[in-house]
Structures are given as structure tokens and as C-alpha cells.
Design a protein with these regions (language model features):
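S-adenosyl-L-methionine-dependent methyltransferase catalytic module, highlighting the catalytic core
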Residues: 3-30, 54, 75, 80-82, ...
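Conserved SAM-binding motif I beta-strand of class I
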Residues: 69-75
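Conserved class I S-adenosyl-L-methionine
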Residues: 46-55
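Conserved alpha-helix/loop element of class I SAM-dependent methyltransferases that forms part
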Residues: 27-46
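Conserved SAM-binding loop of SAM-dependent methyltransferases across substrates and taxa
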Residues: 56-68
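A short acidic, Gly/Pro-enriched loop at the edge of an enzyme's catalytic core
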Residues: 109-119
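Hydrophobic/aromatic anchor residues within beta-strands of the central parallel beta-sheet
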Residues: 70, 99-101
């Protein structure tokens, strides 16, 4: 992986996003480059990738810009996304991303069996109001033999939560998002590492890996949190159970 080249390409894509969204997406570039490295490692150009629940982020369009054939599945109904969805999805389409608008918790994935090299879902399953089990099994069924599944989620027992919850601070969602909106789309249940390993066993994945990172701290509004993240991140990577963001990478048997 040429990290500098990838970073430059993803930053150029972020600059094409409308208005303030460009700044928001630019802050996400390090996370997106890391996610791309998990998904694309060792793949030849032209490999097929599906991203489930990727929304308007840079992952799918970034993978397409790097030469992959990409399908993005999402309902795009997050409140803040609706006014800008069409403009951003046009950027995706120009680079060849196939857009499949659907709520995967209610509608089955419309994938042919054994048709994808990699399927990913980042920061999505914790929002689902139905069990993710059925959809995850559909993802594995759509992978080619030896295909890669990558799941990224927030860690419900990361170090920050272990420190702040005893102090009475640790709400997952704002009152406005939970109480005032017609449909709650926040976090329903955040997993931990034991949950990811449970999923891996249920899906019969092989060669599984668990990784940890701490992306949220880098873009926190709190300067002390940003500084603490910079100082602690390299150490915490060795202890994924304490990290804010955890990943499962596994392969279809």
C-alpha cells in the first residue's frame, strides 16, 4: 500500500464534497485510508467489493478511485444526509460505484452467491434495529471462496467509557436524536471483542484477526482528548479491547 498516494487521492475526493461536508470528510481521511487498507490488501485492480451501510462516506468512492468495482448498499436516510445525498452520490456514480438503495434490516441483499472478493461494513451494524445475523450470513454467502469479510464497530467497553461511566458520563446518543426524531437511527447495541469473535464463529470465518484503533479522539472537539489520543494511540493498538474502534477481519472457508 502506498499510504501517501492513497491519502492524496482520498483527500482530493473529499474536496469534491459540497460545502461544509468537504471539511467533515477531510477529517475522516486517515480512518478511510486504514479501512481501505484492510479491505484492499493484496487485491488486484478490478476486484469486486460491496460496502454495506457505508452511507455518504469516502470508503466506497475511494475504493472505486483505486480501481475496484464497488457496490454501495444503504438507505441514505440519516437526517443530515438527505439534503446532500444526491450531489454526493453523483460523485460516486461518476467513478463507477453501483448504488443499491435499501434498508438491509428489512430487505434481503440482492447479491449473487459467491460473487464478491470482499464485503465490508463499517460503523453500521450497531445502528440496526433488527439482529444483524441474517444479513451477515447473506454477506458471507455472497463472498467467493476465500473472500474477505471486514466488520468495523465502536467498542462498547473502550478505555474512555471505562473511565467516564463511573463518573456518570457515557450516553451513546443525544436526547434529541432518541426522543425528538420520528425514527431513532443512533446506536442500538455496540459490540465488544468477544461479540466480534462470536460472530466470526457463527459465520465460520477462518484466519480471523481483531484490530483496534482510536479514530474518534483525533477529531474530538476537546483539545485534551485530541492530545491524549495522539499520545496513547500507538500503545492502545496493542490492546484492542481498550480501543474506541474495533475491527474483525476474516475469510470465507
Amino acid at each position: 500500500m502506498n499510504g501517501i498516494s492513497w491519502t492524496n487521492q482520498i483527500e482530493s475526493l473529499a474536496a469534491q464534497y459540497p460545502g461544509d461536508e468537504a471539511c467533515k470528510q477531510r477529517r475522516e481521511v486517515p480512518r478511510i485510508v486504514f479501512n481501505l487498507s484492510l479491505a484492499l490488501d493484496g487485491l488486484p485492480q478490478g476486484s469486486r467489493i460491496a460496502d454495506i451501510g457505508g452511507g455518504l462516506g469516502l470508503f466506497s468512492v475511494g475504493a472505486a478511485a483505486l480501481g475496484m468495482r464497488v457496490t454501495l448498499v444503504d438507505d441514505f436516510q440519516d437526517r443530515e444526509n438527505i439534503p446532500i445525498a444526491d450531489a454526493i452520490l453523483n460523485i460516486h456514480r461518476r467513478l463507477g460505484v453501483e448504488i443499491d438503495r435499501r434498508d438491509v434490516t428489512h430487505d434481503r441483499l440482492d447479491f449473487e452467491p459467491a460473487s464478491f472478493d470482499v464485503i465490508t461494513t463499517f460503523d453500521s451494524i450497531e445502528h440496526w434495529h433488527a439482529s444483524p445475523k441474517g444479513v451477515l450470513h447473506q454477506m458471507v454467502a455472497a463472498l467467493k471462496s476465500g473472500g474477505r469479510l471486514v466488520i468495523g464497530v465502536p467498542n462498547c467497553v473502550n478505555l474512555r467509557k471505562r473511565l467516564t461511566v463511573p463518573l456518570g458520563r457515557g450516553k451513546w446518543s443525544s436526547m434529541a436524536d432518541w426522543y425528538e426524531q420520528p425514527t431513532f437511527r443512533g446506536h442500538v447495541r455496540e459490540p465488544d471483542i468477544s461479540d466480534l469473535l462470536y460472530i466470526a464463529r457463527d459465520l465460520k470465518l477462518t484466519n480471523t484477526r481483531i484490530l483496534g484503533r482510536n479514530w474518534a479522539g483525533y477529531v474530538s472537539a476537546s483539545r485534551p482528548i485530541r492530545i491524549a489520543t495522539i499520545l496513547s494511540n500507538r500503545l492502545l493498538r496493542h490492546f484492542p479491547t481498550l480501543c474506541a474502534d474495533i475491527y474483525l477481519v476474516g475469510y470465507k472457508s
